[in-house]
From Swiss-Prot:
Oligomer and partners: F-type ATPases have 2 components, F(1) - the catalytic core - and F(0) - the membrane proton channel. F(1) has five subunits: alpha(3), beta(3), gamma(1), delta(1), epsilon(1). F(0) has three main subunits: a(1), b(2) and c(10-14). The alpha and beta chains form an alternating ring which encloses part of the gamma chain. F(1) is attached to F(0) by a central stalk formed by the gamma and epsilon chains, while a peripheral stalk is formed by the delta and b chains.
GO CC terms, sorted: plasma membrane; proton-transporting ATP synthase complex
Subcellular location: Cell inner membrane
Alphabetic keyword roster: ATP synthesis, Cell inner membrane, Cell membrane, CF(0), Hydrogen ion transport, Ion transport, Membrane, Transmembrane, Transmembrane helix, Transport
Protein name listed in UniProt: ATP synthase subunit b
GO MF annotation terms: proton-transporting ATP synthase activity, rotational mechanism; proton-transporting ATPase activity, rotational mechanism
Function description: F(1)F(0) ATP synthase produces ATP from ADP in the presence of a proton or sodium gradient. F-type ATPases consist of two structural domains, F(1) containing the extramembraneous catalytic core and F(0) containing the membrane proton channel, linked together by a central stalk and a peripheral stalk. During catalysis, ATP synthesis in the catalytic domain of F(1) is coupled via a rotary mechanism of the central stalk subunits to proton translocation.
Length: 156
């Protein structure tokens, strides 16, 4: 191997170039690469965190939907129960009103029957007196007439 001044000069230039690169170019380059690696790592961590948050949010949404369905079903069941109770109450009120109307109609019919019997007794008494009067062909005085009517009413 031939070692001459050119080789030493090239070595000096190489070491000067190496020193300049190591001193001025390499640190910013390493810093830029480190920053880039950090940004990539932060981005991946943020993506993982976002994915976990999305999964958690989906679970919360599913839970909220299940609760809403349960609450909706409960409200429907409560409404149906209230409607059934209201229908039963209306039915009971209608039955009570019907029973009251029937009792009132029976009482009224009984009163009409009683009044009709009284009227019939009065008419029978008058007819009996008229019949007796025609048979006897005479007029009965007022006191005897009243006594006869009362006696006929009592007998009928």
């Amino acid at each position: 191997m031939n070692l001459n001044a050119t080789f030493f000069a090239q070595m000096v230039v190489f070491f000067i170039l190496w020193w300049v690169v190591a001193k001025f170019i390499w640190p910013p380059l390493v810093k830029a690469l480190d920053e880039r690696a950090k940004k990539i790592a932060d981005g991946l961590a943020a993506a993982e965190k976002g994915k976990a948050e999305l999964e958690l949010a989906n679970k919360r949404v599913d839970q909220a939907m299940a609760e809403a369905r349960t609450e909706g079903a409960q409200r429907v069941a409560d409404a149906e129960k209230r409607a059934q109770l209201t229908a039963d109450e209306i039915k009971q009120n209608a039955q009570a009103e019907a029973a009251r109307i029937i009792a009132q109609a029976k009482a009224e019919a009984e009163q009409q029957v009683t009044r009709a019997r009284e009227a019939l007794r009065d008419q029978v008494a008058v007819l009996a007196v008229k019949g007796a009067e025609q048979i006897l062909k005479r007029e009965v005085n007022a006191q005897v007439h009243t006594d006869l009517l009362n006696q006929l009413k009592a007998e009928l």
